[in-house]
Amino acid sequence: MANDKGSNWDSALGCSYLLTEAECESDKENEEPGAGVELSVESDRYDSQDEDFLDNASVFQGNHLEVFQALEKKAGEEQLLNLKRKVLGSSENSSGSEASETPAKRQKAGAKRRLFSENEANRVLTPLQVQGGEWRQGFNEDQAISHRLLQLVKSKNATVFKLGLFKSLFLCSFHDLTRLFKNDKTTNQQWVLAVFGIAEVFFEASLELLKKQCSFVQMQKRSHEGGTCAVYLLCFNTAKSRETVRNLMANMLNVREECLLMQPPKIRGLSAALFWFKSSLSPATLKHGALPEWIRAQTTLHDSLATEKFDFGTMVQWAYDHKYAEESKIAYEYALAAGSDSNARAFLATNSQAKHVKDCATMVRHYLRAETQALSMPAYIKTRCKLATGEGSWKSILTFFNYQNIELITFINALKLWLNGIPKKNCLAFIGPPKTGKSMLCNSLIHFLGGSVLSFANHKSHFWLASLADARAALVDDATHACWRYFDTYLRNALDGYPVSIDRKHKAAVQIKAPPLLVTSNIDVQAEERYLYLHSRVQTFRFEQPCTDESGEQPFTITDADWKSFFVRLWGRLDLVDEEEDSEEDGDSMRTFTCSARNTNAVD
C-alpha cells in the first residue's frame, strides 16, 4: 500500500489545519540545531528586498564639511589641553580612553559614521595619527629618561647610583680616593667633589671662580649615556666644613645638593695619588696651582725610593727637647709633625705606634727625672726662670704680703731656709680664714717651681706620696684635722726634711730626701695642743685680711713672671749660689743633652 503524500488531517475537526501547519515557539525548541538556518536566511533576503522595494523616500545627506571641521576643532582642543597639562599619554592611555566611552557616545558616533564612507575616514585620520604618535613617542622617551634619572637621584639608593656612575666614568671607586668624615661640621682644607648633571658652561666658569678661594684646583668632566659627572680636587686657603663646601658649590654650579658627593682626599694612599697625578697629565683636565705635597711625595721617584726607616731615638730626642712626658701628648704632637718630619711620617706608617709612644714616654720621664735630680736648687730655679714668659714685677708679691700685714723680710728668711732644705725648716704653713689668698699664693709658687700637689683624699692608698720621688717641692692644700693627725702620726720625718722611703706602684720603694712642703689650712696648728710635736716642725704665716672685692673676685694675681722677677731680684738675699755659673766662668762649655744616635762623622 503506497504512502500518501501531504498532510494527514481529519476533516471532521475544523481547526486541525491550524494545529498542524502553524509555527510555534515550542516547535522551535524541539527542533535540532541548524535545522532552520537556511529558512531564516532565505526569509531575511526576501524581507530586505521587500523593504528596499517599498522604501523609495529620498535620504537627507547633511553638511559633511561642517561636521568634519567640528570634529577637527574638538580634536585640536583636546590635544592643546593635553599639552598644557603635560600629560601627553601613550598609545595605551589613548586606547584606554576609547574603551572607557559610554554606550550613548558609541551610538552617537555610529550615527554620524553614515555621513562618511569607511575608507574615506581612514584616509583622513591615519596620517595624523601616525605623525602625532611618532612625535609624542620621541618626547615621551626623553621625558622618561629625565624622569628616571631624577627619581634615581631622589630615591633611597641615590648614593649607590651616584657611586656606580662615578666608577663607570672614571674607572675608580670614589671611596678609593677619599676618607670618611661622618660629621658635616668637621673642617678640612682639602676636599674631593663629585658633581652629577653639571652643565658645560658652569663647569668651565667654576675654574675662574675657584681660583680666588683655592691654592690648588684640579677638575675633570666625563659623560656617557648614563649621565654626566665632574670630579674636583680643591685645596682651599682656609679650612671649610662639608656643609660650607656643599652650599658654595651648589650655588656656583647651579645643581641640587643631592647631586654632590664630598669627602676629604686620601692623602696616604698611593693609588689615590697616582689617580690625581695621571689625571693632571690629561689635556681634558683643568688645573690651577702646584700639586699638593702629599701627591708629589708619593709620585716622585726620589721620594718613593728614599723611604726612611723609623728611628726610635729620634722620636725620644724630639719628645725630650719639647719636654713631652705624657703618652697622649707625645702621640698627638708627633702625628702633627708628620707634615715636616720624615721620621714622624715613618712613625705613622709603623704597626706599633702604641708601643713606641709608651716606650718614648717612659724614656723621657727617666731622662727628665735624672736631669732634675742632678741639678742643685739654684740651678733648678734658674731653669724654671727660663721657662717663664712675659713681663712680671716682684712688687706684686711685696704688695700682697704688706696687705696681709706680713713683713717681706720674714718671708724671705723663711723661704731661704725652705729652699735649702734645712731640717726643721722644711715646711711652711699658711694659716687663716677662707678667702684670704692662701691657696692663690701657694699654687702660684708651686706652679713656678714645677712641684707636685698632694691630695689627702688618696691617703688610704700606699702610693699617694709616690709623686714626691720626682718632685723638687710639694703642696698640700686645705689641710683639715684628719690631715694634721696623719702628719703627726706618719710624716714627722718628712716635715723635718730628712730622708723618707716612698712606695711606688709596681716598683721597689725608693729612699729620697723629703722635698720642701707647703701647707694651707684654716686650722692654727700652733694653737692646738694636740699637735704639740708639730710646733717645731712647721713655720706658720697668718693671713687675716680677705682678698676678695665686692663682686667676689680677687684683686691680687701672682704669675710665673712675677716669681721670676722675685727670684732674680732677691737672688743674693736667698743665698742661691749657682755652681754652674762658676764653671762657665772658668771656661767649661755646656752641651745640650743628646739621647739619639747621631752621625758618627759629625763633629762633637
UniProtKB/Swiss-Prot annotation:
SUPFAM superfamilies assigned: Origin of replication-binding domain, RBD-like, P-loop containing nucleoside triphosphate hydrolases
Post-translational modification: Phosphorylated. Sumoylated.
Positions of the UniProt region annotated as Disordered: 24-48, 90-112, 581-604
Keyword list, A-Z: ATP-binding, DNA replication, DNA-binding, Early protein, Helicase, Host nucleus, Hydrolase, Isomerase, Isopeptide bond, Nucleotide-binding, Phosphoprotein, Ubl conjugation
Any single Gene Ontology cellular-component annotation: host cell nucleus
Location relative to the cell: Host nucleus
Biased composition (Polar residues): 591-604
Motif Nuclear localization signal per UniProt: ranges: 84-86
Stored Gene3D superfamilies: 3.40.1310.10, P-loop containing nucleotide triphosphate hydrolases, Zinc finger, large T-antigen D1 domain
EC identifiers of the protein: 5.6.2.4
An annotated GO BP: DNA replication
Main location: host cell
InterPro entries recorded: Helicase_SF3_DNA-vir (IPR014015), P-loop_NTPase (IPR027417), PPV_DNA_helicase_E1_C (IPR001177), PPV_DNA_helicase_E1_N (IPR014000), PPV_E1_DBD (IPR046832), PPV_E1_DBD_sf (IPR046935), Rep_E1_papillomaV (IPR016393), Znf_lg_T-Ag_D1_dom_sf (IPR037102)
Biased composition, class Low complexity, residue ranges: 90-101
One Pfam family cited in the UniProt record for this chain: PPV_E1_C
Residue ranges constituting the SF3 helicase domain according to the UniProt record: 406-556
The protein's assembly and partners: Can form hexamers. Interacts with E2 protein; this interaction increases E1 DNA binding specificity. Interacts with host DNA polymerase subunit POLA2. Interacts with host single stranded DNA-binding protein RPA1. Interacts with host TOP1; this interaction stimulates the enzymatic activity of TOP1.
Family as reported in the entry's similarity comment: Belongs to the papillomaviridae E1 protein family.
Biological role stated in the UniProt entry: ATP-dependent DNA 3'-5' helicase required for initiation of viral DNA replication. It forms a complex with the viral E2 protein. The E1-E2 complex binds to the replication origin which contains binding sites for both proteins. During the initial step, a dimer of E1 interacts with a dimer of protein E2 leading to a complex that binds the viral origin of replication with high specificity. Then, a second dimer of E1 displaces the E2 dimer in an ATP-dependent manner to form the E1 tetramer.
Protein name (record): Replication protein E1
Gene: E1
